Amino acid sequence: MHPYLISIGSFHLPTYGTMLAIAVLAGIYTAIRLGRRVGVDSALILDYSSWVILVALIGAKVLLIITLWSYYRAHPEEIFSYATLKLGGVFYGGFLAALFFTIWYVRVRKISFWKMTDVLVPSVALGTAITRLGCFSAGCDYGKPTTAPWGVIFSNALAHEATGVPLGVRLHPTQLYESATTLAIFAVLLWWSPRKKHDGDVFLGYLGLYAAGRFLLEYLRGDENRGFVFHHLLSTSQFIALLVLAGISGVFIWRRVHGSEKASALSEGSSTEFSQVAGANAGQRKNSRGNHKAKRKMQNSKPV
């Protein structure tokens, strides 16, 4: 495709880097707009974003190095090389690093984790949709060979050199598949956000939708160097997606159990209060009837 958006002499503007910058700006803008609706301060989101972006980039690189450890163990000098710096990294590495940072950040700032993440995850979905367009332009995260009419053929030698994408072969445009998937998730989250019943619903919904979509899309990926587990049975991202789905199921079960216990406690409390009120009313009616009878007896009695 077009790994460089602009090339003037020795100056080259990478398409991936440009799309990443656009994704960051679009994500921050979206988070600020959504935050205002629920009372999250814009300055807080800007401060958080300036840190979490750096943390996510480092996390993505770290998981990339872990998944390709057999190569980096043999070539440790490449860990801090420019070639590694140019690589995009692994999404889940950046996401998990950002998640742990968020847990720490909200504790320090004393704000609700669920409320904060509900504001942020639509921006993550939108940012992923934009960034994957940069991946498509650079040739990374390419798909398996296909005979489908919408398959794409890469012909840029620079893309092949940087990402290893096969040239002259019709491939699944998995980058566009994921871009469309995350854009659809973004639309669902925007619709869901004002209709959620509990804080955290949007965050958990994003985790489930993305994990399911990513798990299926991994079967169409053709870049074999992205890392696998269990003797090539699952890719690293598929394994993490399964852990995420299991974690979400646990949270929903916990919420359901504790929600039922809370509802039961409220019901018992209401029943007790109702019984007390009913007993008090019955006592008042009994006293009233006793006073009325005493008054009638006094009126009917004759003086001696």
Protein language model annotation of sequence segments:
Residues 1-291:
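A feature for loop-to-transmembrane-helix boundaries and adjacent hydrophobic helices
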Residues 293-304:
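Arg/Gly-rich low-complexity intrinsically disordered repeat tracts
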